[in-house]
């Protein structure tokens, strides 16, 4: 995805929308450090959502300077948020939204990146539990004057996590 974005083959970035959600706050144990604001500093946004935010910043090369958010403790009643809704804008005008959730019920990792001549969709996440589904990259190439809402797309599936091999 980074290579495609940096190549400018699909044009400039228009927006990004990411969802990183899981079904609980790691455990139902009220004494878990992740559910204690004093120990963790925050809830699902700092625990999981920060990884989506880092990915958005990495792929776009942008820092977000305008940030609006709503955090909520909609279900778990812990000392930290179980949902965070974040709307961001960079100095160059890139608008991005992020939803980090511990009430997703079905684990989800999805990042949609809209560019001038297409979109990229990163889906799934290779984890030990396999609960986030297959890791995929969908490339959509669009010509709005001809596609009539049905652009060409191709999806690649990734079966091996080499991220630890690439760590410094």
Question: What is each of the regions a protein language model found here?
Answer:
Residues 1-77:
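Predominantly a Rossmann-like dinucleotide-binding segment in NAD(P)-dependent oxidoreductases
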Residues 23-30, 83, 142-146:
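Membrane-targeting and insertion segments and their boundary/processing signals
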Residues 76-81, 91-167:
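NAD(P)-dinucleotide binding in Rossmann-like oxidoreductases
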